[in-house]
A protein has these predicted regions:
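Cleavable N-terminal export/targeting peptides
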Residues: 1-24, 216
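Outer-envelope beta-barrel architecture signal
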Residues: 16-29, 53-59, 107-113, 166-168, ...
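Flexible, solvent-exposed coil segments and beta strand-coil junctions
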Residues: 20-28, 68-79, 133-143, 189-193
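Extracellular loop and loop/strand-boundary signature of outer-membrane beta-barrel proteins
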Residues: 30-33, 75-86, 141-148, 194-200
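Gram-negative (and chloroplast) outer-membrane scaffold detector with strong preference
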Residues: 46-137, 213
Length: 216
């Protein structure tokens, strides 16, 4: 809590010190990539508007997907199809983008700290292809099951370091989220068998992010 308060004080003090004479920093377009501990990659495009120099509000549009899965719902008669095993979703994420004034400044670059709390809204729907199989495990046909039960939203925060080479800014650091990548699947079932027990226990995820932004 003390760290958060110190960060906010630095943001407000920096905004007051700089003044509002230069509007070139008010609009920021960004492209962010992220890798997480839940074996997901994430890519998003963002726009933020800065009413004051070091605090902006905006929205991101993106997608996340698993590159490795942790559970396969299956019985002796069926199993989930290979193409349905990795979770994925498009999302919309409103967020705040906070930056400190430059802590290190040279002729070509300003370096400081940044934070971005956000609210991720995923597509509240999931669909799975079921592969039917015979007693030898060979496929005999396909079916489909879908559902919209599950926690479709998540809270997230990114904390890191930025380097501003006006008008381009690079940011990198740590990302945390309470996103459950299996949320929309846990409530699904096929022929009386629930998918939930096949998936790992719900846990928060952490990871690393890199952003390239351009100020207008």
């Amino acid at each position: 809590m003390a760290l958060a308060l110190a960060f906010m004080v630095a943001v407000v003090a920096g905004a007051a010190d700089k003044g509002q004479d230069d509007a070139a920093w008010r609009h920021c377009l960004g492209l962010t990539g992220e890798l997480t501990s839940s074996d997901t990659w994430q890519l998003e495009a963002s726009y933020h508007w800065f009413p004051v120099r070091y605090a902006g509000i905006g929205v991101s549009l993106g997608m996340w997907e698993q590159y490795s899965y942790g559970g396969v719902p299956a019985t002796n008669e069926w199993r989930t199809d290979d193409d349905s095993r990795c979770m994925m979703s498009a999302f919309l994420m409103p967020s705040l983008l906070l930056r400190t004034p430059a802590l290190i400044r040279t002729e070509s670059v300003d370096i400081g700290l940044m934070a971005e709390p956000g609210f991720m809204m995923n597509v509240p729907y999931s669909s799975v292809t079921i592969e039917m199989k015979d007693k030898w495990g060979l496929p005999t046909g396909y079916d489909r099951v879908s559902g919209n039960r599950g926690r479709w939203y998540a809270f997230s925060v990114r904390i890191g370091v930025y380097a501003a080479f006006d008008p381009v800014t690079l940011s990198l650091g740590y990302a945390w989220s309470d996103l459950d990548v299996y949320a929309m699947r846990r409530g699904m079932a096929y022929k009386g068998t629930s998918f939930g027990p096949f998936y790992p226990e719900r846990k928060n995820l952490g990871g690393a992010f890199l952003r390239v932004a351009y100020s207008l």
